[in-house]
Amino acid sequence: MAETEALSKLREDFRMQNKSVFILGASGETGRVLLKEILEQGLFSKVTLIGRRKLTFDEEAYKNVNQEVVDFEKLDDYASAFQGHDVGFCCLGTTRVKAGAEGFVRVDRDYVLKSAELAKAGGCKHFNLLSSKGADKSSNFLYLQVKGEVEAKVEELKFDRYSVFRPGVLLCDRQESRPGEWLVRKFFGSLPESWASGYSVPVVTVVRAMLNNMVRPRDKQMELLENKAIHDLGKVHGSLKP
């Protein structure tokens, strides 16, 4: 109870600062849930989506969401889209199966890094990166290697605050079907929570951990949250809607 009350106070203090935020990857499952939670909590005075296409929303809550459509192959031409945001969330990502090896590297490393560079130049103070459990630039696995590489490259940009989230298998009802994901989610979803939490995590828990972490003051410039820390922080709901 004391923890949720403290979190509610932190949220209220954060709201009073009238900060602005951008989200990269709002069309994906994590980005979509993140946007929903941000709007429900009313944490920012301005919310901007940066993506390759404009998204359509029917709900009234989304009417004031700003959208910047960019060409990720020519991001330097869209530097203005990254200007004036206090906080940034990057949920960009694809798979090797969908985009091929070169396409995967281009999206998950090159697009992310260039976006971070433009955000830093545009005045962003706190950059949040959705990475992956096991990310390691020295890994022999391309997926984990690329995730580790971009983590390190973004850290070199020296944001005032840089938060990296490394969730395990994301449990969600993904709109876009990816080969094998349904079976994996079904497997982890059927396991006892105490065991599954080491290897998987619901998307909504990741999102809540991101936002709960954001409103808490930190002295460290860089912070890394592994799957267990994401579980623990994401379970503190405070005044969040169920």
From Swiss-Prot:
It is found in: Cytoplasm. SMART domains: Semialdhyde_dh. Keywords: Acetylation, Cytoplasm, Disulfide bond, NADP, Translation regulation, Tumor suppressor. It comes from the Eukaryota. The active site is at residues 143, 147. Represses translation by preventing reactivation of elongation factor eEF1A. May also inhibit nuclear import by competing with nuclear import substrates for binding to a subset of nuclear transport receptors. Has additionally been proposed to act as a redox sensor involved in cellular oxidative stress surveillance. This is Protein HTATIP2. It comes from Pongo pygmaeus.
